[in-house]
Amino acid sequence: QLIAKTLQPSSGSIEVHGRVAALLELGAGFNIDFTGRENVFLSGAILGLSQKEMVSRFDEVTAFADIGDFIDQPVKTYSSGMMMRLAFAVNTCVDPDILIVDEALSVGDAPFQSKCFRRLRQLIDQGVSLLFVSHDLGTVRSICSRALWLKDGKTEMWGEAKDVARAYEKYCWQEQGVTLET
């Protein structure tokens, strides 16, 4: 939330360079009374894109979201999966420099999740910085090169994603009283 500037730091300052697109929570940034179409343009405007730029990206957004005629229905009528589809499509089609995905892919069906992971990989390959927040260690291992484990708001470990995931798993098992051989 600090990087996305939806929350102010209690002390110090944060400097962010580039366009930040953030999937922080389901429906964040959407006006539920607006249609999906209206929300696409609203989201683009919030991210600093002109209406002309959003018109040129609209077909890509709707094709990726794959919600059909629901694009012209109020977002409040959407299922959580439909809302996530549209939010993900908008945020990944606006050429972000930094993309924040905070547990947002936990909704939606498996084929769409797979489509999202392919899109994330494409964005990473294009040089987009991805800040991916998840408790799904398999996904962290497959998408992230580096990982940060926070415990009580403080850095517990920072390093290669596979090493951090392994240490976190070991910690979780030990918390449950299970000892693992290393």
For the regions a language model picked out, list residue spans one by one:
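Conserved catalytic segment of ABC-fold P-loop ATPases
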Residues: 142-149
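ABC nucleotide-binding domain "signature motif"
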Residues: 10-20, 155
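Conserved H-loop
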Residues: 136-142
